A protein has these predicted regions:
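Repetitive helical segments and hydrophobic/amphipathic motifs
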Residues: 11-12
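Positively charged n-region of N-terminal signal peptides that target proteins for export
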Residues: 1-6
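C-terminal motif of bacterial Sec signal peptides marking the signal peptidase cleavage site
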Residues: 15-19
Length: 189
């Protein structure tokens, strides 16, 4: 009888030891979800036109007050002359290089207002600083245009928000620059 109890205790001990060893290996194994891609990573990159559409909707922008230049709509693309006019600066000595631009959408006022939004996507994020220089030229030109007769609009242009994130770069001349930028950042991240 003592022998059978001893054998039972020994078997029980070995079973418990073996079971603990198996659990230790399971806990050390990598989890299957470690190499998965999240839904956000699978979604297609947002277009500049989609970003501007969201801004127009969210901030109730009256699009009748603006010309829209959208890369995805061939009839509304910027031509070389318009690019030079918009971004070369007040003295037109700069020849803007938009060769890294793969997408854009702009709202440019048709009224006497400085309000303007431009969002660009680049194939090389290192070109963002150069693009920001062109946007600064645009803001300075708009500020000087309005300075003699509309100080509020001139100030709006002087306070332009010019920024970038990843391959997107933008400028915003509105009364709600930071709110619009938050919308842009929400959409591109």
């Amino acid at each position: 009888m003592k022998k059978s109890i001893l054998i039972s205790v020994l078997l029980l001990s070995l079973t418990m030891l073996f079971s603990c060893t198996q659990n230790a290996h399971i806990e050390e194994a990598p989890e299957y979800g470690d190499n998965t891609v999240s839904f956000d990573e699978l979604k297609a990159p947002v277009t500049c036109g989609e970003i501007v559409s969201e801004i127009v909707t969210k901030f109730s922008v009256n699009t009748e007050d603006f010309d829209t230049f959208d890369y995805s709509v061939e009839e509304s693309r910027l031509d070389e002359g318009t690019i030079s006019y918009f971004y070369s600066g007040q003295d037109f000595t700069v020849s803007p290089d938009f060769s890294h631009v793969t997408d854009y959408c702009l709202l440019v006022p048709v009224t006497t207002a400085a309000t303007e939004i431009g969002i660009f996507k680049l194939d090389d994020a290192s070109a963002a600083e150069e693009m920001k220089g062109y946007f600064a030229n645009r803001a300075a030109a708009r500020a000087s245009t309005f300075a003699p007769y509309n100080e509020a609009e001139s100030e709006k242009a002087r306070d332009a928000l010019i920024s970038s994130e990843g391959s997107y770069v933008w400028y915003i001349m509105t009364d709600t620059n930071s709110d619009i930028e938050s919308t842009i950042l929400e959409m591109i991240k």
